[in-house]
C-alpha cells in the first residue's frame, strides 16, 4: 500500500524556511532527516545560518548508520562550498575520505593561503593530492614546491619550534614566572 505524502511534504516545505529564519536549524535538520529529504536543506541555508547548520550536521553524522552519515556529510560539504568556506569544506571532505571531493574542494579555492591551510589539513589526515599532475595541478613552480613541502610534513618539526618560540614556551617556567 503506497502512502500519499504530498500533504506531509507541503507542511515540511512550510516548516523548514520558518525554522531556518528563526534560529532553529537543528529542528529543521532533524525534520529533514526524518522525512529523508535532506537534499533540500542547502536551498534554505544562508551565510548567516550556515555555521550552526553545518556544525549540527557534522555532529549528527557521528551518530548515524553507515550510508546515512555520508549523505549528511555530503550535504554539509555542499553547504560549505555554497558559502565559499573552503577550509571547512575540506575538513568535511577529509572526514568523508573521498578523493574526488577533496580535489574538488582544493580546486575551488583560489587564495594561496587557503590552499596552504588545506595542504596542512590534508597532510594531517594522510590524504595527499598529486599537485604536479591531474585535476589539482598547480602550474606556478614556487607554489607547487611550497605546497608539496607542506603536504609531505617535512617542515613540521621546524614549524612547531617556530610556534613554541612565538608563544615563548621554549623553556619550562615556574608558576611564579607566569
Task: Give the residues covered by each predicted segment.
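Extended alpha-helical assembly domains of large eukaryotic scaffold proteins
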Residues: 1-178
Amino acid at each position: 500500500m503506497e502512502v500519499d505524502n504530498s500533504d506531509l511534504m507541503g507542511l515540511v516545505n512550510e516548516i523548514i524556511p520558518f525554522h531556518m529564519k528563526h534560529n532553529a536549524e537543528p529542528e529543521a535538520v532533524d525534520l529533514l532527516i526524518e522525512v529523508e529529504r535532506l537534499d533540500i536543506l542547502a536551498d534554505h541555508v544562508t551565510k548567516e545560518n550556515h555555521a550552526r547548520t553545518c556544525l549540527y550536521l557534522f555532529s549528527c553524522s557521528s551518530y548515524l548508520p553507515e550510508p546515512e552519515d555520508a549523505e549528511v556529510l555530503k550535504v554539509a560539504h555542499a553547504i560549505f562550498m555554497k558559502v565559499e568556506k573552503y577550509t571547512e569544506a575540506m575538513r568535511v571532505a577529509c572526514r568523508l575520505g573521498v578523493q574526488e571531493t577533496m580535489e574538488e574542494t582544493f580546486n575551488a579555492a583560489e587564495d594561496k593561503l587557503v590552499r596552504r591551510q588545506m595542504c596542512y589539513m590534508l597532510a594531517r589526515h594522510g590524504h595527499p593530492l598529486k599537485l604536479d599532475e591531474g585535476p589539482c595541478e598547480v602550474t606556478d613552480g614556487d607554489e607547487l614546491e611550497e605546497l608539496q613541502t607542506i603536504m609531505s610534513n617535512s617542515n613540521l618539526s621546524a614549524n612547531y619550534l617556530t610556534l613554541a618560540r612565538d608563544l615563548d614556551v621554549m623553556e619550562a617556567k615556574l608558576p611564579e614566572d607566569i
